Amino acid sequence: MDLHSCLNSYFLLLLLCLLNITTINSTKPLEQETVLFGGNFPAFYVIGDSLVDSGNNNHLTTMVKSNFPPYGSDFEGGKATGRFSNGKTIADYIAIYYGLPLVPAYLGLSQEEKNSISTGINYASAGCGILPQTGRQIGTCLSLSVQVDMFQETITNNLKKNFKKSELREHLAESLFMIAIGVNDYTFLFNETTDANEFANKLLHDYLLQIERLHKLGARKFFINNIKPLGCYPNVVAKTVPRGSCNDALNFAVSIFNTKLRKSLSRMTQKFIKTSFLYSDYYNYMLGLRGPSSNQVGSSLLNVTSPCCPNVYDGGQLTSCKPGSIACKAPDTHIFFDPFHPTQLANYMYAIACFHERSICHVILED
């Protein structure tokens, strides 16, 4: 067995111990928890950014792409698919958890394929955000509203051909809808002069409008992933003083949005009957990988500050993993594959934590 295989086996066993899977809360689950954590979903629809993009940006005129090595080195066949990792994304692991196939990218499907797929589609687009103007400087972008537009087209042009009206209503009501977007709004549009509260309110307004659109289209079960601690990611910590410390001001700004989002979802459970929200606290999960405080590296086994690609990352000068970039030999020793995105191992760790720790993923209840 080579070093890479040994590390894979070692870390998987280690993670099972660290996450203490056997200590799941044994109290009787709520009805919503039974549905969202153990539901038999017919389909999985994904809306978001590069965290969950499965290849839509391959088909866009944009500088943000990952359809080249060393991306995908640990994916099936070692192929770069357009996922921003060395392997699977968190959306992939969620699909696997629910017994569904990996969700294909909308723009990579032929019309015939769109007509035949009934287990879900991925509309996520790297570099894009909640606001329409986010990411325009890097090329064509599929904003949150555009992705919802595409889902509406899926209903009109494809799903209606496969389902009777009552069947389609049931299909949509029983399917799971994941939304994982918002970090690029902070990356491109937020700075030290921006009022964090006003900015969060602006994002939230547009975000909730799109949830309402999805609900009107028939969605009833949502998986809402909050925004990551951007201030602790390699592209940021490489430029902080002291180097490696988080930008706490940026994290605080993001946390304002996350808090508002969670409260708004709680109110929505009262507004929308028979609608459930599973809230994923991705922010605190990723922050927790660093250790007890945001400026303390919490693991001697995993590199939590530097990316695997590029392997040489000096002061933020190399800001992306590009064609020809040399990656580290063992991605499973890193939390981040590139300066902006987690490794497959980190995504796998998240999936375990999400479905076995209610502090990470939990059903939103009424206030």
UniProtKB/Swiss-Prot annotation:
The keyword Signal applies. Keywords: Glycoprotein, Hydrolase, Lipid degradation, Lipid metabolism, Secreted, Signal. Residues 1-26 form the signal peptide. InterPro entries: GDSL, GDSL_esterase/lipase, SGNH_hydro_sf, SGNH_plant_lipase-like. Its EC number is 3.1.1.-. GO terms for biological process: lipid catabolic process. One of its GO terms (cellular component) is extracellular region. GO terms for molecular function: hydrolase activity, acting on ester bonds. It is found in: Secreted. PANTHER family: GDSL ESTERASE_LIPASE 7-LIKE (PTHR45650:SF14), GDSL-LIKE LIPASE/ACYLHYDROLASE-RELATED (PTHR45650). This is GDSL esterase/lipase At2g03980.
